[in-house]
Amino acid sequence: MSGGDGESSYAANSRLQEKAILKSRPQLHDAVEAAHALLLPSGSGKGTTMVVADLGCSSGPNTLLVVSEVLGAFASRCEKKPVHVQFFLNDLPSNDFNLVFRSLELFTKGKGATWPPYYIAGLPGSFYARLFPDRSVHLFYSYCLMIRSKVPADLVSGAILNQGNIYIWETTPPSVVKLYQEQFLEDMSLFLKLRHTELVASGQMVLTFLGRKNSDVLRGEMSWI
């Protein structure tokens, strides 16, 4: 999908992503509360800034929906310990960050009166690489770990091995399924290793996946969250 906010844009075709964010709200609010508990009390002489990163933030209303949910969790659960919240919105450099930044003014005008002070920055780059200094992030959120870091090497030969499909389906050869499963294991292991280095001790992650309800990887709609 394209950038901007036109008919074919991601912003206009992301209802499933919105559903995933709202469905994971209880887990996200729990994670915010747990991460908030890690912060030093005000008056300790040290900073009370919580760092939150949305990995694969996209562009459009869902990007700021995650921000809104995090801030809403502070308003409802974390009133006793004052805090500032630093958000990093991460996606590939090709993401339409300009659309995100243009929507910030309207978002700020509609903010909740009980939200803590917050700051939003864009962070272009792949989440399959280092993004933050050691032990610097309190909470990671991502909906995008279904996306692989690359096409498996054995599928780059030019031969069409998954003809007629844009993802794994009933007619996908078992050899192709195996290659993507191996790529997932490689990517997920790398992702967890990187985030482990970047998370503060006892930091939190909320990772939402889209898959199939059926245990058969070749059958069923790709809409199970």
Per-range role (PLM):
Residues 1-135, 148-172, 207, 212:
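N-terminal charged/capping segments associated with class I S-adenosyl-L-methionine
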Residues 24, 66, 184-191:
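Alpha-helical packing segments of well-folded alpha/beta enzyme cores
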Residues 135, 187-194, 198:
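Short, conserved SAM-binding segment of the class I
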Residues 142-187, 199, 213-225:
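Mobile active-site "lid"/loop adjacent to the S-adenosyl-L-methionine
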Residues 199-205:
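Short glycine-dipeptide loop
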